[in-house]
Regions:
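Short glycine-/acidic-enriched loop or helix-start segments at secondary-structure transitions
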Residues: 20, 43, 92, 122-124, ...
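A Rossmann-like FAD-binding core segment of flavoenzymes
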Residues: 71-91, 95, 170-220
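Conserved N-terminal glycine-rich FAD pyrophosphate-binding loop of Rossmann-like flavoproteins
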Residues: 37-61, 189-192, 199
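Predominant activation on well-ordered alpha-helical scaffold segments within soluble catalytic domains
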Residues: 22, 68-71, 109, 135-139, ...
Length: 220
């Protein structure tokens, strides 16, 4: 099997992976970033809304704009990107990589795993029915593939992610019946909640989802 040597190998070209690559490159390291997708930026490409926060932390920019900015900065620092590349295991010989149909081992002095986050979810009767999905999946369908996840939907969770996704589904043409929150208060920013209320979407606190009903997909 072919072997390659690299100083630093980062697995994942999302916001964490690119940021790590930039900092390492600024310190003088030779950095290679591998990602299974064909674009750099990871979840940032799902984020079509403008970010809040400090000006030096990309406030006022949309996620895909942040991704492009980070990509440009990384490439200017000499960071090498391997896209459409799968890292399938870390062994004593090195990191197993499949790239462009070739299987090889990368021997790196340092390996940073930034393979992405996992969304929290709530299990309930019917939660495995087709039509029940996490926020990230809904964003991927609507914002990347331009496919509406559903015509009528309920969003569970009133944190910033839930509120933003609910509004994005409205923008995409879905009917958002409600946002439900188990706590006694809304978890996200008031500006996001107010935007939904203005659009006629009720937000119910102290409310839990009991079940999703349907035989082959969600019907209620």
């Amino acid at each position: 099997m072919k072997e390659l040597e690299r100083e630093i190998l980062i697995i994942g070209a999302g916001p964490a992976g690119i940021s790590a690559a930039i900092e390492a490159a600024k310190a003088g390291a030779k950095v290679t970033v591998a990602d299974e997708h064909d674009t750099i930026g990871g979840q940032l490409y799902k984020q079509i809304h403008k970010f809040f926060g400090a000006a030096d932390n990309h406030a006022g920019m949309r996620g895909f704009e942040i991704a492009r900015k980070l990509e440009q900065e990384a490439k200017e620092l000499g960071v090498e990107f391997w896209l459409n590349t799968v890292a399938y295991g870390i062994f004593k010989e090195g990191v197993g990589i499949v790239r462009d149909g070739d299987n090889f081992i990368v021997k790196a002095k340092k390996v940073i795993v930034a393979a992405g986050g996992i969304e929290n979810t709530t299990a309930f009767p019917g939660s495995t029915l087709p039509g029940v999905m996490l926020a990230g999946a809904a964003q991927t369908m609507a914002n990347i593939h331009r496919v509406l996840p559903g015509k009528r939907m309920v969003v569970v969770g009133s944190g910033n992610v839930g509120l933003i996704v609910a509004y994005q589904m409205l923008q995409a043409g879905a009917e958002v019946l409600a946002v439900v929150e188990r706590d006694d208060h809304i978890g996200g920013y008031g500006v996001h909640a107010e935007r939904l209320r203005t659009a006629g979407v009720p937000i119910f606190t102290d409310t839990v989802i009991k079940c999703a009903s349907g035989k082959t997909s969600v019907e209620g």
